Amino acid sequence: MTEANKTTINDAQKIAGSDPREAGTQLRPGLWPTINERYPGSMITKETSVPLAPLTKPLNQARLVMISSCGVHRKIDRPLDVCHPFGDFGFRRVPSNAKPAELTIHQLKYPHDDADIDINVAFPIERLQELAAEGTLGGLTPNFFSFIGYNMDPERFERTVAHDIAEAVVVEEKADVALLVPA
């Protein structure tokens, strides 16, 4: 970024004559203080909290599923759509016994250079396999789940992707506990 392109909140405030954090105020063309100001309604805010489900058995007897927003998938699977302006409303199943060399991250919304070297940085599949093998975990579900966290219609995401993953985790995978891994 060149010196001429750097704009601070204070600089923008001096130029605009108002607080640039006010809704609808751009710092400069294409730069908004928050994503919700650029795309109103893009953030889910809830008045109620979701109660945690108590663990009903010891972890060394529990079957774990991993759910990640990093966009990982097997190289042989169709990648998630990273070009659609509203995001992808799908997800990928990743076999829990997959090898890192079989996996890739197809994602443009965050840097994943380190995860390209070691997938466990964003999707700790080998660490979970090790914990299951040593008996710290009772086991792993046959599949883990991954989706793209970038999504501009969170209510649709909640109704579709989140609902479909939750149903698969409970009905098909029969998970006792879920590890949520944000990217």
Regions found by a protein language model. Give the residues of each.
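Metallocofactor- and cofactor-centric catalytic cores in central/energy metabolism, strongly enriched
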Residues: 2-183
